[in-house]
């Protein structure tokens, strides 16, 4: 269940989540209808085993999961059938249908195909830290993260969550770290980075599996390139790549964190899941607070 990416948003810590368990069943995922392309709603974080449990709270951490069902209707299939239909009309009537007629034909085909289309299921998990006012979504896509915010907004009626905003330019901070400026306590450089020329359409350099403080990197910095992605390690617990868009990618829990699971109490799948949730939530909080200080992240106003 460990998250692999983090797209973060902030919300006011004054928000009231006391009614969340009552509200979520009203916005639970419904099966996609015969003539619908997609459906979204909340599902159980625990999967099929506990379908009626739509949230999970542990102290100040709240785990929510947005589920989705999408009809798979390949565009190539629709277009192929459309061309056949157009050819039939042309042969029968001696004319090719115009733009509006083709659009109507295409809509009719989609309407006909939808009830028979395969359905693809998906889930997007999120952890809300109610004490510090942030939500971490397990995605590297800002759009997917915004979709989760929209679903929570639909459940609560109002959810003034905003993407992270740094009071200092993230590129400047990342570039400074790779150039030799001291990193925050607990952080160290990894072995991956991406550098870009600041001009639009400028050169992009990607480095992997190499020492990030050396002559080769220095030459790129001297040429004016700026760091847009940087691999970092937090203690011996987490490794990740931080982007100048403030999205955390390639998140990995290391032995320093995983060793703590050996001392968890309780037996069974649910107890193990609780232990992993507690560990992940605590480590993500540590990382967030570290980055909040280093990047001067703005707080959300009520």
UniProtKB/Swiss-Prot annotation:
One of its GO terms (biological process) is DNA recombination. It holds the Pfam family RdgC. GO terms for molecular function: double-stranded DNA binding. Keywords: Cytoplasm, DNA recombination. It is found in: Cytoplasm, Nucleoid. InterPro entries: RdgC (IPR007476). PANTHER family: RECOMBINATION-ASSOCIATED PROTEIN RDGC (PTHR38103:SF1). HAMAP family: RdgC. Belongs to the RdgC family. NCBIfam families: PRK00321.1-5, PRK00321.1-6. May be involved in recombination. This is Recombination-associated protein RdgC. It comes from Xanthomonas campestris pv. campestris (strain ATCC 33913 / DSM 3586 / NCPPB 528 / LMG 568 / P 25). The gene is rdgC.
């Amino acid at each position: 269940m460990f998250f692999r990416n983090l797209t973060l948003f902030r919300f006011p810590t004054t928000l009231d989540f006391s009614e969340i368990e009552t509200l979520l069943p009203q916005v639970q995922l419904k099966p996609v209808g015969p003539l619908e392309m997609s459906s979204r709603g909340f599902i159980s974080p625990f999967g099929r085993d506990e379908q009626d449990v739509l949230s999970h709270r542990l102290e100040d951490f709240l785990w929510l999961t947005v589920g989705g069902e999408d009809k798979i209707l390949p565009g190539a299939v629709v277009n192929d059938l459309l061309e056949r239909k157009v050819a039939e009309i042309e042969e029968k009537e001696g004319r090719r249908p115009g733009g509006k007629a083709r659009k109507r034909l295409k809509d009719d085909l989609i309407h006909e195909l939808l009830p028979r289309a395969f359905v693809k299921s998906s889930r997007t998990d999120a952890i809300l830290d109610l004490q510090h006012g942030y939500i971490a979504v397990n995605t590297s896509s800002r759009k997917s993260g915004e979709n989760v915010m929209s679903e929570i907004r639909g459940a609560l009626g109002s959810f003034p969550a905003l993407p992270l905003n740094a009071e200092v330019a993230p590129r400047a901070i990342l570039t400074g770290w790779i150039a030799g400026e001291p990193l925050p306590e607990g952080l160290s450089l990894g072995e991956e980075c991406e550098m870009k020329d600041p001009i639009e359409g400028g050169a992009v350099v990607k480095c992997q599996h190499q020492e990030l403080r050396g002559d080769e990197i220095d030459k790129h910095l001297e040429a004016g390139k700026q760091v847009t992605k940087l691999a970092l390690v937090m203690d011996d617990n987490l490794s990740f790549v931080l982007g100048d868009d403030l999205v955390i990618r390639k998140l990995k829990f290391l032995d320093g964190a995983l060793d703590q699971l050996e001392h968890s109490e309780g037996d069974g799948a649910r107890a193990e899941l609780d232990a992993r949730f507690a560990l992940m939530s605590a480590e993500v909080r540590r990382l967030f607070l570290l980055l909040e200080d280093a990047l001067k992240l703005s707080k959300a106003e009520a």
